[in-house]
Regions:
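Glycine/tyrosine- and acidic-biased, solvent-exposed loop/turn segments at the edges of beta-strands
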Residues: 2-276
């Protein structure tokens, strides 16, 4: 029995060696982590998460002031977009190539600012809750320009859209579409002043054609429909019903000589002779 006891003693001592080594490594690692954490803390680096009004969030990891306010670092949005932010310079560089310079509040765009998109589009104006919102100017890479009211990135309110070919629309917008009263002047010289509904001439309006002809009256879904007056540049005048852009129904036609016809028309043709 004494011999067995002597054999076990050294084995126990051998087992303690690796255990002590593992414990030493763990303690050393914990101390290193604590030192790193303290260094990060005293260097002003922090992690901050801010909830946004739309139910999303913005995560920030970077340098803060003594008051805990972010200054520069990396931000991650709830939609997965990442960016480098420098609040001292009021700038954000997004991972997709977009850049922003302007006012920020809680790490999001709010106030006056300018954003240059990776595709070449540029917006300069008001922001709210990280969205284009308010009055501003949007310049498209195509050369088109919109200046006016915007609601969460869409044309809404009153504004002017200028196409690269020189065509211009000034008037009311809703949900990114011409809607309400407006004036549209085309590059060829034709123009329309009147009511719009969802991008189409709809309601009462006046249309002047490039050749000088004029129509004043009712429109439905971008076509002359209902009662109206069409005046040709040669002096002829028609007052009456229109259907699908064509003289259809009852009306009065007056020639420059003073001769008139009042009666029924079908597809622009007189169907009863009632000339005076």
């Amino acid at each position: 029995m004494n011999n067995n006891t002597r054999r076990r003693g050294p084995q126990r001592r051998k087992r303690r060696g690796p255990l002590r080594l593992i414990m030493t490594i763990i303690i050393a690692a914990a101390i290193c982590l604590a030192i790193v954490a303290l260094c990060i803390y005293f260097s002003g680096v922090r992690y901050i998460k801010i909830d946004t009004a739309d139910g999303g969030f913005v995560k920030f990891f970077g340098v803060v002031t003594d008051l805990g306010e972010p200054t520069r670092g990396k931000i991650v949005y709830s939609n997965g977009v990442t960016a480098e932010v420098n609040l001292e310079r009021e700038s954000i560089i997004y991972s997709n190539g977009d850049t922003y310079a302007g006012e920020l509040r809680n790490l999001i765009k709010e106030g006056q600012g300018k954003i240059i998109y990776a595709n070449g589009d540029i917006y300069e104006g008001e922001f709210l809750g990280d969205s284009i919102h308010g009055h501003g100017k949007y310049s498209y890479v195509t050369g088109d320009v919109y200046e006016g009211d915007l609601v969460y990135g869409k044309k809404d309110g009153v504004g002017t859209y200028t196409w690269i070919d020189g065509s211009v629309y000034t008037g009311e917008w809703s949900d990114d579409k011409k809607h309400g009263r407006g004036i549209y002047t085309w590059a060829d010289g034709s123009s329309y002043t009147g009511e719009y509904a969802l991008e189409q001439k709809h309601g009462q309006g006046d249309y002047t054609y490039a050749n000088g002809d004029k129509y004043s009256g009712s429109f439905t879904n971008d076509t002359r429909e209902g009662r109206g007056t069409y005046t040709w540049i040669n002096g002829e005048i028609y007052e009456g019903d229109f259907k699908s852009n064509t003289i259809n129904g009852s009306g009065k036609y007056t020639w420059p000589s003073g001769r008139t016809y009042e009666g029924t028309f079908e597809n622009g043709v007189i169907v009863r002779n009632e000339e005076t």
